[in-house]
Amino acid sequence: MANVWGVRLADSLSSPTIETRTRHYTLRDFCSDLDAVAGKEPWRPLRNQRTNDIVAVQLFRPLQGLVLDTQFYGFPGIFSEWEQFIKEKLRVLKYEVLRIYPISNYNHERVNVFVANALVGAFLSNQAFYDLLPLLVINDTMINDLLGTGAALSQFFQSHGEVLEVAAGRKYLQMKNYSNDDDDPPLFAKDLSDYAKAFYSDTFETLDRFFWTHDSSAGVLVHYDKPTNGNHYILGTLTQMVSAPPHIINATDALLLESCLEQFAANVRARPAQPVARLDQCYHLRWGAQYVGEDSLTYRLGVLSLLATNGYQLARPIPKQLTNRWLSSFVSQVMSDGVNETPLWPQERYVQIAYDSPSVVDGATHYGYVRRNQLRLGMRVSALQSLSDTPAPIQWLPQYTIEQAAVDEGDLMVSRLTQLPLRPDYGSIWVGDALSYYVDYNRSHRVVLSSELPQLPDTYFDGDEQYGRSLFSLARKIGDRSLIKDTAVLKHAYQAIDPNTGKEYLRAGQSVAYFGASAGHSGADQPLVIEPWTQGKISGVPPPSSVRQFGYDVAKGAIVDLARPFPSGDYQFVYSDVDQVVDGHDDLSISSGLVESLLDSCMHATSPGGSFVMKINFPTRTVWHYIEQKILPNITSYMLIKPFVTNNVELFFVAFGVHQQSALTWTSGVYFFLVDHFYRYETLSTISRQLPSFGYVDDGSSVTGIEMISLENPGFSNMTQAARVGISGLCANVGNARKLISIHESHGARVLTITSRRSPASARRKARLRYLPLVDPRSLEVQARTILPSNPVLFDNVNGASPHVCLTMMYNFEVSSAVYDGDVVLDLGTGPEAKILELIPPTSPVTCVDIRPTAQPSGCWNVRTTFLELDYLSDGWITGIRGDIVTCMLSLGAAAAGKSMTFDAAFQQLVKVLTKSTANVLLIQVNCPTDVIRTIKGYLEIDQTNKRYRFPKFGRDEPYSDMDSLERICRAAWPNCSITWVPLSYDLRWTKLALLESTTLSSASVRIAELMYKYMPVMRIDIHGLPMEKQGNFIVGQNCSLTIPGFNAQDVFNCYFNSALAFSTEDVNSAMIPQVTAQFDANKGEWSLDMVFSDAGIYTMQALVGSNANPVSLGSFVVDSPDVDITDAWPAQLDFTIAGTDVDITVNPYYRLMAFVRIDGQWQIANPDKFQFFSSSTGTLVMNVKLDIADRYLLYYIRDVQSRDVGFYIQHPLQLLNTITLPTNEDLFLSAPDMREWAVKESGNTICILNSQGFVPPQDWDVLTDTISWSPSLPTYVVPPGDYTLTPL
């Protein structure tokens, strides 16, 4: 692909090859043009490409005789008015012409185009035109008829012996709204009255003799191919200029420019069977070459004209409608630095045609063209497939060559090309609804005192922490925050079950008081949650009977100080959204006192057995102590909820069974919850303080930020090396971050802009470089289209990262946390992007192994950085390859699938290979469920029969294994290894990498990624560790025994659950599990630990050895949930009365159950008046269900509400309800299955339509006082005996 100065040419040739036959212009044609029939007018409107307004008109014959100043014509300045004006004028002129030349006699007579143009011009300027009429029809030739006396009849013509001089009439006309705007069409000086003169003669030799004696310093132009109206030369007027910012060009150059662009456009459109009016549209320089230098625009346009005639094409397509902006940019490229890289150079007296040019103009025209046999272009012939402009920047993937430069040289070029400082759009750190975490009271948990609960961080009100919270809040994309939080809290609160009755504490139709209601919400004069709540539009939250509002700022309630006693009345549910910061500010003693007062107000306003929610801005031990002493003894259950919307320590406390005596306490579950809660806050607070401020100006100094460079008129000719170094420098600064390019016109120049983001990760990769690897610019060079720019955005993913990206970030965090300075790393399944280079210290040598070729450069690194292209499951390759730590993320499952191996076989082969390595630590992501197997809809489907994972988003499936099998394979190879199943911490510490790399996170994606991690965990194997021996499987609630050999009596063992210390053998009385004992057997030199756990999950063990308490990893163990098997035993005789049928449910008592119904693919909690769970006198679980005719048309399930995800462990269909045989000899209950209209038929006859407008039940039906429909909002009817069926309408 060649360049002509700054103009890039395509790598193929194309040229028109068929020319249409010349057709004479007749009187009929002339009269038709004067008619100006719609669609056939002799003009074309031109529009501003931004406003779409008509701003100019292109004129065709016979309107090309307008040679006077525009005021002489009296044209309106608005196109619609001009068009009406001109049509009326032309119609009058037509009648004058036909009066002299009746169409019946002169129909096919040839018209002199010169005279036709002059006639129309004279008529429109109200000048004498009758003397021209006798010359309208050609007598001899167009030229000869006007030589001599004819030339004196108009200012249009002038005779010079055998040469006729014709004033070039306007080809364009400006409307009054033409302003030479960037988006206006260019007019190439042809809207001016005297932009050029044309000289006509029968032969070119006569014209040459004429110009021997005349000044030709302006440059004489010629059309050799089918010159319009006869042989002629064009002499542009040097005094007429046209603007193409930053250049001013004369009329001669404007004519050259327009004609060569027309030819370039014709070349792209050329097809073998498509004729054109003229094979060569270009003007060529016939005289005056001695007056133009090679740096002049005239000369360079002459070169481009020669190239266009020979079939060259512009790599950058010419838009269908030119604009001043585009033209200015093109002229700037023509005038930019560079050289003519083609073999063609213009000659003054003829046009060279290369031997292999596709143009046939030399055969069609016998004058002016010479084909040179020795001149060859060596290019293929093919029309360029032009691409339309792209409305936004496009990602660019750099590719590297073996060439290198100094890193400092790259920094220098970046500093010259950078567009910093700039103010980017900030974007959103986090998007989506609340990411909710919760814990509720569990009597099986260990009792914990308020003094043992974690304390609010002492630094919470420090200035830098306030900055971090403020930044997160500003960059958190969300609607009404109160609405999002309230909705999340209500959804969790309404799922709470009273274990004594099996019913929810919160039910439909309860009276509600809303404390802290505000009229200051956008678009509403009350909290936004109230309307959807009362209308039953919040999934899983039934509507209350009423909501009364109290607070300082209410509009639909009572103004009151909620911290003092007031006559509130009693409510079954009190929801308090009162902020303690309003009165308490940052004084914890004042805010804690307010919490106590507000808790008292909630208790006083809640009716016996009711519930309340209380927002706590600052959960201190003082607050927990007050609740422990005053609230817990007077409620039957509680829940803590954190709807994570913005980063703060705010929590919601939910109390159930108010004013009922109990012995509730805080539990270890609350302790673990609060540890995660405070760690989560501190993690995100620390990250936020490292991010640039909201609305910042990026000057390159922040660790995270925008990098942007621009190249003007990037011809990649003389500036190739400098441009490459600058682009390569930017790539070094941003590493693997996404790079976007735009190519557009700016102030007359064509600009290539590359935008990306720097981060601590990219800084680590750059610090590894010794030399700067140079990119291959070809993928940028071939870009001929316009790619429009946009303002850079720091966090630019408006929808947030996908679950798979979040999952990858979790793995990246584990890898970066495991590798320290100087560790030698062996990374398997590296991938072409080699992300590992951004995760590990720049001082750590690394060997990257992948079956795919790397996209990374080689030979440019400070420390050993090796890329091996091979199958790491093959034998023999690892000899001599050093690696202290082996990492393998998101690879082994794919490798096993690619080789049609089971996961066990692939893992065993990997272990076999690694036994010959020098590795101490293995960090491997494995396909292995660590929890109850459940499909993650849309992301992970699990085939338990064939042990396969299927990933629907990628159309890929992989094998999986189980934890015991993988541990056995490891211990067979390394008997003394310790194995840790790296747990996913809910404190979100992994988000540090994501947010500092400007990755927008989504609540929904984070939640799905957390679920996927349970099936795709990271397995850490410390080959030379000290193993612990687990006695059997560890089950929640059962005694678990652990033997740890090889340690001394003074050594201490710590056990961690997520981020929190579960217990330490140094003080087993402070353990956060229900029971733990630790004994040391001096004879055997081993420790024995007996434990009882109340929470399922992964626990990790660490030994603190010796007087220095050196930490040693012992691995981890998994505490499983109890067996999830469940059966429902129905009695032989079903009870269809209101007493209901008792169904024996066999399930582990660990699980709490609720009945659900699936409606339109959505889960809904079933009416607790229909399904009730309770313990029988013998201690077994019983489900009482009241039967309804509608049950046969619904899908009911028993689901557990044990985990963070409802139904995660148990999802058991109640299939019998769909097949029950209804009796016909007793009264039955009947409800509508859903909100649609249903036809009720008895013995096949329709008797009524449920849910129909104005529905009135049959007279022999009664309404049940308390509905037993699945939905409390649908009534239940008592119907007489019969054979009933329901049909949806």
From Swiss-Prot:
Compartments where found: Virion
Class of this enzyme: transferase
Site residues by UniProt (Involved in formation of the phosphoamide bond): 190
Binding site for ATP: 893-900
Keyword terms: ATP-binding, Capsid protein, GTP-binding, Methyltransferase, mRNA capping, mRNA processing, Multifunctional enzyme, Nucleotide-binding, Nucleotidyltransferase, Outer capsid protein, S-adenosyl-L-methionine, Transferase, Virion
Superkingdom, taxonomy of origin: Viruses
Assigned GO CC terms: viral outer capsid
EC number(s) on file: 2.7.7.50, 2.1.1.56
GO molecular function term, any single one: mRNA 5'-cap (guanine-N7-)-methyltransferase activity
Database matches in InterPro entries: Ig-like_fold (IPR013783), Reovirus_L2 (IPR010311), Reovirus_L2_4th (IPR048604), Reovirus_L2_6th (IPR048603), Reovirus_L2_7th (IPR048602), Reovirus_L2_8th (IPR048294), Reovirus_L2_GTase (IPR048601), Reovirus_L2_MT1 (IPR048598)
Catalytic activity: a 5'-end diphospho-ribonucleoside in mRNA + GTP + H(+) = a 5'-end (5'-triphosphoguanosine)-ribonucleoside in mRNA + diphosphate; a 5'-end (5'-triphosphoguanosine)-ribonucleoside in mRNA + S-adenosyl-L-methionine = a 5'-end (N(7)-methyl 5'-triphosphoguanosine)-ribonucleoside in mRNA + S-adenosyl-L-homocysteine
Pfam families assigned to the protein according to its UniProt record, in alphabetical order: Reovirus_L2_4th (PF21062), Reovirus_L2_6th (PF21060), Reovirus_L2_7th (PF21061), Reovirus_L2_8th (PF06016), Reovirus_L2_GTase (PF21063), Reovirus_L2_MT1 (PF21065), Reovirus_L2_MT2 (PF21066), Reovirus_L2_N (PF21064)
Assembly with partners or alone: Interacts with protein mu-NS; in viral inclusions.
Family affiliation: Belongs to the orthoreovirus lambda-2 protein family.
Entry function: Outer capsid protein involved in mRNA capping. Catalyzes the last 3 enzymatic activities for formation of the 5' cap structure on the viral plus-strand transcripts, namely the RNA guanylyltransferase, RNA-7N- and RNA-2'O-methyltransferase activities.
Protein's name in the database: Outer capsid protein lambda-2
Record lineage: Viruses, Riboviria, Orthornavirae, Duplornaviricota, Resentoviricetes
Gene name linked to the record: L2
